[in-house]
Amino acid sequence: MENAHTKTVEEVLGHFGVNESTGLSLEQVKKLKERWGSNELPAEEGKTLLELVIEQFEDLLVRILLLAACISFVLAWFEEGEETITAFVEPFVILLILVANAIVGVWQERNAENAIEALKEYEPEMGKVYRQDRKSVQRIKAKDIVPGDIVEIAVGDKVPADIRLTSIKSTTLRVDQSILTGESVSVIKHTDPVPDPRAVNQDKKNMLFSGTNIAAGKAMGVVVATGVNTEIGKIRDEMVATEQERTPLQQKLDEFGEQLSKVISLICIAVWIINIGHFNDPVHGGSWIRGAIYYFKIAVALAVAAIPEGLPAVITTCLALGTRRMAKKNAIVRSLPSVETLGCTSVICSDKTGTLTTNQMSVCRMFILDKVDGDTCSLNEFTITGSTYAPIGEVHKDDKPVKCHQYDGLVELATICALCNDSALDYNEAKGVYEKVGEATETALTCLVEKMNVFDTELKGLSKIERANACNSVIKQLMKKEFTLEFSRDRKSMSVYCTPNKPSRTSMSKMFVKGAPEGVIDRCTHIRVGSTKVPMTAGVKQKIMSVIREWGSGSDTLRCLALATHDNPLRREEMHLKDSANFIKYETNLTFVGCVGMLDPPRIEVASSVKLCRQAGIRVIMITGDNKGTAVAICRRIGIFGQEEDVTAKAFTGREFDELNPSAQRDACLNARCFARVEPSHKSKIVEFLQSFDEITAMTGDGVNDAPALKKAEIGIAMGSGTAVAKTASEMVLADDNFSTIVAAVEEGRAIYNNMKQFIRYLISSNVGEVVCIFLTAALGFPEALIPVQLLWVNLVTDGLPATALGFNPPDLDIMNKPPRNPKEPLISGWLFFRYLAIGCYVGAATVGAAAWWFIAADGGPRVSFYQLSHFLQCKEDNPDFEGVDCAIFESPYPMTMALSVLVTIEMCNALNSLSENQSLLRMPPWENIWLVGSICLSMSLHFLILYVEPLPLIFQITPLNVTQWLMVLKISLPVILMDETLKFVARNYLEPGKECVQPAPQSCSLWACTEGVSWPFVLLIVPLVMWVYSTDTNFSDLLWS
């Protein structure tokens, strides 16, 4: 039924043709069941395991690897001789990588689907209905309830469907609907129509929503929606419709894979075409087909060389390390790629309650009457420190601490707060914090009594558990609470009837009253001044109300409660307590004692975090279900708005936002910093608008209602105290529910992205080097310098360790002084592409050069000519060009060992280059990242292992090197550092100056100024080593001459 909240009870019952006392007939139930179906949320049709597995192989990079593995496997099958076993190593290793990758992917996907299933937790199993086949209420399965059923609900029940209340059978009906609306305080319901057809769920006071809990009272109602038509069902549909966006990193890697695949394909085809002339060479037995297959194998080797197989593993490791660091800061990341997405967050949409504020109501101001003279009066105003439930704080008057027992009015005010109260404080030893037991408002009054300590109770030496209610206990020992007149909507107050524990002639029974100021003060005939009772005049009443209005609408927007007493109440026997309509008669002729103002205070650390966000170019938007006045007041206190800033067109209620046309709504999302009184659908709409501006949005939420928006936002952030649905729909969970934790996570995300850029570029330049190496050997006609199994070893192991260690690079000091990076910014810019291409070309040329050195110039080598080396395939005994040359030397393991050793050593030097994008090694020495130094040592140790420990040299087709050969390796490898230092210098001084927020002061050109910040220990270590390496003779010049 549409808009049931706007209809009267009679209209709703008439719509379903049902009587409240008898319920539906079985015939009606059958028809309605056929029309509306079962009252349950349909199970999510998840993808089958096979579909999920196939999905993992849709990535282009993965498909290329798979193709390379299949071709390698086929070629290995037809391999002959000693290489048969080693030929199978390559396809098996690639397949293992792909299987591991698929397992991780499937596991992550499975987790994502659990969010919708978690909604079913909120479906009750049973419901109590009235139907015509029985004369009394009957319990049936909740899924059998249909629209039109008359349902009975009582305290502790879970509401089985969306229900329009028809009658309330207790004084009040309180409902905890926090899972749906995010409201932390239980809501008082009534049966009157709510005329507004566009009312938000918070304002539908005559409706009960499926999945919410009854906190107090008993009532009856008619079911108006079941299953997917309920509010919780609409949330489920929205979640099903929400497609998970790929993170910026995933998009970047997809683009990179696409570019790489095109480049690889072109190079492979080019290598094959270049060598068409060699297909008939004698070494292939003169068979064109065998020649074609041989060069096809080289092209496959090239594909393996070009693909950074270690990249998925290194990225996963880096993100996992990042999540561990974040977990220490109370940010628990559920989805690995979202760690990096945090780094480009440009908007944070945050809930108010519990995230920007403490979610711990606290009294911060109060007043009592000081003097009254006719229509004029003066007030004693006090402020109270402390913003949590901890009973620690002081009462101040004119910024000076006061002793509350010196004011009679404060003693009586504390007595009312302690006795007219059903809540208490409790110390949670496990968490080490004070918590509320009961309602938030009443707990704030309990905490105030502890801070006031009006009877000067000795508190020293008490344990924290005893301290929690020490002062309240003293007051409760003086008077005994006989009964309570519960809160009701008509009088907006509650009261307790108390009698003295030690009866005497002077001490009599009293009623203590608290409630909304306008309701209570209208029923006050007197006011308390000190210990005397003075008649209330119109002037005094006006003065009191003007102060309360100022508190309620000023910069604090406090929630005010008036406190009063009835000094001579009727005796209990004279009261008719069964009918709550009589309660207002007994709460008249009251004496006004004072007023307290409370609020949910902002967290102390939030203001500095909001300031940090502003510095970092991140817009903070508060989105709350609270009213606009309170929301704007909190925004001013934490710095989202300035103290005097005009909030026109910057703060909207959900209703105001809906009334705007689409163009104005876009503008609102572009400029606004506060949305109040919103529904979940508004959150999703705001996220959509922000995404249309290419903003990367982080959205916080804790209720079931927040799940669709959490799923839609790039970064969904659930509260640690939130619902299971919110947590499963989100990418990150805040263990401490604290806004400042989000800002710390954003900072960590930026640092992780910077480090990731470094190791991705490091791995790419390594792969470029390998491609150039294979391309050069093919183009020059040299023997193979590197074989696939060696390339796999380098890509996965020796490169993988330093790449992972680059994830530990220290973050830049000014990381939060820069605006968020553009998510569309390429991973590798034009200049960086040139830079790493240049480095890669050197790596490839040096690797080929090392192999050529052994053939042409090494003392223990064959010393063949360049022509003989480049035409080695024509080597035969009867060829005059190869007279005196043993053709077997072209299959020697030494040149491969030289090439592999140079490749590994250059990569270690390259890892040092990647310590910083543009900072020189002279200013940022290797020990800035001790993990990197350790990983380089480990990688070199592993290289020595495969060189010198049998039978590994046989598997990798290499052989041990002597000292001279190692010196040559160092001579060829070290120039890569000088080369990158030159490129960094160009970038620093000519291409990328001015990217910093703060421009450096101009420096003088003195020698001291130029060497400032240089790490002299590094200089003293490296210079003698380089001089020694290049002073030894290794026939390096012979290679260059040839």
Swiss-Prot record:
Topology Lumenal: residue spans: 70-89, 274-295, 777-786, 851-896, 949-963
Family matches, as NCBIfam families: ATPase-IIA1_Ca, ATPase_P-type
Post-translational modification, as annotated: Nitrated under oxidative stress. Nitration on the two tyrosine residues inhibits catalytic activity.
Modified sites of kind 3'-nitrotyrosine: Y294, Y295
Residue ranges crossing the lipid bilayer per the database entry: 49-69, 90-110, 254-273, 296-313, 757-776, 787-807, 828-850, 897-916, 930-948, 964-984
Keywords from the named record: ATP-binding, Calcium, Calcium transport, Disulfide bond, Endoplasmic reticulum, Ion transport, Magnesium, Membrane, Metal-binding, Nitration, Nucleotide-binding, Phosphoprotein, Sarcoplasmic reticulum, Translocase, Transmembrane, Transmembrane helix, Transport
Function, as annotated: This magnesium-dependent enzyme catalyzes the hydrolysis of ATP coupled with the translocation of calcium from the cytosol to the sarcoplasmic reticulum lumen. Involved in autophagy in response to starvation. Upon interaction with VMP1 and activation, controls ER-isolation membrane contacts for autophagosome formation. Also modulates ER contacts with lipid droplets, mitochondria and endosomes. In coordination with FLVCR2 mediates heme-stimulated switching from mitochondrial ATP synthesis to thermogenesis.
Enzyme class: translocase
Compartments it resides in: Endoplasmic reticulum membrane; Sarcoplasmic reticulum membrane
Name of this protein: Sarcoplasmic/endoplasmic reticulum calcium ATPase 2
Reactions listed under catalytic activity: Ca(2+)(in) + ATP + H2O = Ca(2+)(out) + ADP + phosphate + H(+)
Domain notes: Ca(2+) and ATP binding cause major rearrangements of the cytoplasmic and transmembrane domains. According to the E1-E2 model, Ca(2+) binding to the cytosolic domain of the pump in the high-affinity E1 conformation is followed by the ATP-dependent phosphorylation of the active site Asp, giving rise to E1P. A conformational change of the phosphoenzyme gives rise to the low-affinity E2P state that exposes the Ca(2+) ions to the lumenal side and promotes Ca(2+) release. Dephosphorylation of the active site Asp mediates the subsequent return to the E1 conformation. PLN and SLN both have a single transmembrane helix; both occupy a similar binding site on ATP2A1 that is situated between the ATP2A1 transmembrane helices.
SMART domains named in the record: Cation_ATPase_N
Lineage: Eukaryota, Metazoa, Chordata, Craniata, Vertebrata
Similarity-based family: Belongs to the cation transport ATPase (P-type) (TC 3.A.3) family. Type IIA subfamily.
Protein's organism: Oryctolagus cuniculus
Recorded topology in the membrane: Multi-pass membrane protein
